């Protein structure tokens, strides 16, 4: 009996030993190339998520820079794209989730949170227009004796805009005060020929270089007109006072220096010069025109201070 068990055990060992080479050959198969592709794609998505998240965060950081640093080369241009960095952050967050990049996701969330906080007031107003104002501007014809008015501003880009189209907009939108920037003598002449004086007969136009200027047109008289209300280094910014329901409102046609290479510092200076108008506390101002800046630019927010408000943000 013991011998039989011993023989059986030896046969079993030999059988297992003989099976080993077959098992080794089975594990030597080459890895399929298709199995590598998802891993490479995963790494690419992770790289893009990280890059987009860093760019979105850099955009948010640029928006938070103090005024003196926002005059650095190209900083104003980057800041002007602030709302778009929100979209870039959302794309980065989606890619980070797909590729499981936690750090990239956290950076993207931080950028989205900052930009969302800054842009939210532009989409939700806590102080809507009074019903009386809505009724006034919705009337078939403007009432120049009340305290409400529709105003409009255009940069006509070196006098290349269509004067007839502007006059038609003034008529159709019942505009009572119009501000134009980069006008020329020829453009103003064509504007008069198109009939602007029929709707806005009072005007004040001025030019600092004799070529391009800024102007104001009004349905009611412009009291105390000036060629340059701001004493700006950028351009003459004409002003005039309009009686609106017994309230004297000072309108100014604004055109600051553009933030382009070689003029970064001049751009900030022209906004700082506007900021000096906060000291005129006895005058109620409406500044209309081409500020070459948005609310995201620190120098623009400094100009507003606690005295002025941005109409786009308030509306």
Question: How should each PLM-predicted stretch be described?
Answer:
Residues 98, 106-172:
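N-terminal signal-anchor transmembrane helix
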Residues 32-51, 97-105:
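N-terminal export and membrane-targeting signals
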């Amino acid at each position: 009996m013991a011998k039989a068990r011993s023989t059986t055990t030896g046969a079993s060992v030999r059988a297992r030993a003989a099976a080993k080479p077959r098992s080794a050959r089975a594990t030597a198969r080459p890895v399929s190339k298709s199995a590598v592709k998802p891993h490479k794609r995963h790494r690419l998505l992770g790289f893009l998520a990280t890059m987009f998240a860093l760019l979105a965060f850099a955009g948010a950081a640029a928006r938070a820079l103090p005024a003196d640093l926002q005059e650095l080369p190209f900083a104003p241009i980057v800041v002007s794209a602030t709302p778009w960095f929100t979209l870039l952050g959302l794309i980065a967050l989606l890619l980070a989730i797909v590729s499981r990049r936690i750090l990239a996701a956290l950076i993207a969330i931080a950028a989205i949170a900052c930009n969302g906080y800054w842009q939210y007031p532009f989409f939700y107003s806590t102080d809507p227009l009074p019903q009386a104002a809505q009724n006034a501007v919705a009337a078939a014809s403007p009432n120049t004796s009340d305290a409400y008015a529709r105003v409009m501003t255009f940069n006509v880009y070196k006098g290349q805009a269509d004067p007839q189209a502007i006059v038609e907009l003034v008529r159709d939108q019942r505009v009572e005060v119009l501000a134009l920037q980069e006008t020329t003598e020829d453009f103003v002449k064509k504007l008069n020929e198109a009939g602007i004086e029929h709707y806005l007969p009072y005007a004040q136009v001025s030019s600092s270089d004799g070529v391009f200027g800024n102007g104001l047109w009004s349905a009611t008289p412009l009291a105390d007109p000036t060629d340059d209300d701001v004493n700006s280094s950028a351009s003459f910014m004409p002003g005039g006072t309009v009686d609106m329901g017994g309230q004297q409102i000072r309108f100014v046609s604004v055109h600051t220096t553009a933030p382009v290479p070689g003029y970064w510092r001049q751009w900030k200076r022209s906004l700082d010069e506007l900021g000096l108008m906060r000291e005129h506390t006895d005058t109620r101002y409406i500044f209309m025109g081409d500020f070459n800046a948005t609310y995201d630019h620190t120098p623009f927010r400094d100009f507003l201070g606690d005295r002025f408000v941005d109409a786009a943000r308030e509306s």
